[in-house]
Each structure stands twice: as C-alpha cells, then as structure tokens.
A protein has these predicted regions:
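Amphipathic, interaction-prone secondary-structure segments
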Residues: 13-72
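Intrinsically disordered, low-complexity regulatory regions enriched in serine/threonine/proline
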Residues: 49-120
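Short, extreme N-terminal segment that most often corresponds to the first beta-strand
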Residues: 1-25, 118-120
C-alpha cells in the first residue's frame, strides 16, 4: 500500500491539517477546523503514488458542493443548526472557506511533487 512521504506529512501538519493514515488502508483522513469551528474531515484515496493522491484531492475539491454542504447544516427555517452559525450566509461562507482550504491542500501537495521532481 502506498504511504505518504514523511516530509509531506510534516508540511501538511504545519498548515494545521491533521492526518490519519493507516498503512493497511487505501485512504488517508485529512482534517482541519474552519473559522466557525466546523470540523472538516476528508477521506482521500491514496492511489498507487503521490500523483494519484494529488489528483484525488483535486477531484474532492472540484466535486465539493458548497450549497449542498451548507444545506446540511441548516434547520427547516434556513438557520444554522448543530453548532453552525445562525445566519445562512455565515454557514455558506464557512463552507466556501472549507472548499478553499481543500484547494490549498491540493496546492501544497502539487508543490511538494514539483519540488521533488526538480531535486531528482
């Protein structure tokens, strides 16, 4: 099973991303908190190499539906529930932040790949 490089794990951790990787699993869990305290957890398939992992992060970002994720945190009156901000707009903006953070993770991994190809 492919294992993420320790140096990449250290870079992600330094960006306040928690990583749970089981050597026997095809997936890695990436977690972070949004400005409003939303615990965001992503289950990303590692694939056979770092390029596959990077592509899978991008796919997760590209398929992240901010409106749907916002809807999940609204009550029947359109207000935040379960600890989410009261205003729908605030919940939506928090979900946008989460989507941008996922893109940031993609950029970090892509930069790691690019820098290590240059050093080969």
């Amino acid at each position: 099973m492919y294992k993420l490089p320790d140096k990449l794990i250290d870079i992600l951790i330094s960006d306040d991303i928690t990583i749970a990787e089981d050597d026997k699993s095809a997936y890695v869990e990436l977690s972070f908190f949004s400005p409003e305290g939303q615990d965001c957890s992503l289950s990303i398939e590692k694939g056979n190499n770092i390029e596959c992992f990077c592509n899978n992060i991008y796919d997760y970002y590209d398929n992240f539906d901010v409106s749907y994720e916002t809807y999940l945190w609204l009550d029947s009156d359109g207000h935040g529930s379960n600890g989410a901000p009261y205003d729908m707009k605030d919940v939506y903006e928090d979900m946008e932040w989460c989507q941008n953070k996922i893109y940031d993770i993609f950029v970090i991994v892509q930069k790691y790949i690019d820098e290590n190809k240059e050093n080969e």
